[in-house]
Amino acid sequence: MGKLYTALGLMSGTSMDGVDASIIKSDGERVYSALFDRYFEYGDKIRQKILAIRQKILVPDHLVKHESEIKDIEREITFFHSNVVKEILNNNKIDVDLLGFHGQTIFHDSKKKITKQLGDGKLLSQLTKKKVVYNFRQNDLKNGGQGAPLTPIFHNLIANKYLKEELDKFYSVNILNIGGISNITQTVKWDELDKKKNYIKACDIAPGNCLIDEWVRKKSKKKYDIGGVLAGIGKTDELILNQALENFNIGPPYEDSLDIKDFDISFAKGLSLEDGTSTL
């Protein structure tokens, strides 16, 4: 077992609706325990700013074109995260060693090795007086990765932790993670006659909830389909769905990470709010 760290992780996904905060204790490999979890919703103003700037950044050059606006929003988001950290630490008697700061993704292109998350790690460290680990996706790209998905490291830890005793010699675990984008992790351990083989394979495979979120925002005053109510009421249009699946052209070998801008909802434009939500 390696050194145990108590870390406060801050994650804001492609739904762009707020920050998930978790305090965990882990050695990063096998030992893991959750100490605190809470969701902090963005205010309407900051959320609209994030949505607006993301829609403006269509190609890498737009990051330069809108640099001033990006910096302003980035500072605002960093202060939001700082307030989250202070509220958590002030209300919970837990001493954390470091903060994990993902930031808010507004652009991701794995082929061009460019990704942008809103969030200033150095400023967050100054505001909270804590060590901050950040630039996860940028560093993954620099080291030959796709910048996404990042969850496989945690999936592998879960497999090692919970399956070691039951399947000591061999296991193959597949974990499907459905966020804005869906990704899958396969973690394998094989140990037979001292022939050891351990590996992790992971990739993005398809859109997850990002299309539903966009559809609901455009067709109603809701931010997303709360509890799947709209989809439950609606009827899936199989013809439109099958045509969309053919046009998406997603399949093996799943070499490139995906971004929500790789997909659009135009194919469902003739459907009602409920039927479109069900189909998407």
Write out the residue ranges for each language-model feature.
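A glycine- and small-aliphatic-rich helix-loop capping segment at beta-alpha/alpha-beta transitions
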Residues: 23-30, 112-123, 158-160, 188-199, ...
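Glycine-rich phosphate-binding loop and adjoining helix at the ATP-binding site
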Residues: 95-156
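A contiguous, well-structured pocket-lining segment that forms one wall/lid of small-molecule binding clefts
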Residues: 221-280
